[in-house]
Amino acid sequence: MVENPMVINNWHDKLTETDVQIDFYGDEVTPVDDYVIDGGEIILRENLERYLREQLGFEFKNAQ
């Protein structure tokens, strides 16, 4: 019996699949996501305000 690599590798080709990246808050980063890198940490754009506030002490205010 011939061993099929698709069956052996759980139907995935490990050589052509990209590694999944995880941002600072544990969210998966896909190739189409917008993100920033700060000191080696990946932060998704939707988590950026939270990161700036919690990690860097930024204060966001409204001009009123």
From Swiss-Prot:
Gene3D superfamilies: YqaI domain (3.30.40.30). InterPro entries: Uncharacterised_Yqai (IPR018474), YqaI_dom_sf (IPR023118). It comes from the Bacteria. This is Uncharacterized protein YqaI.
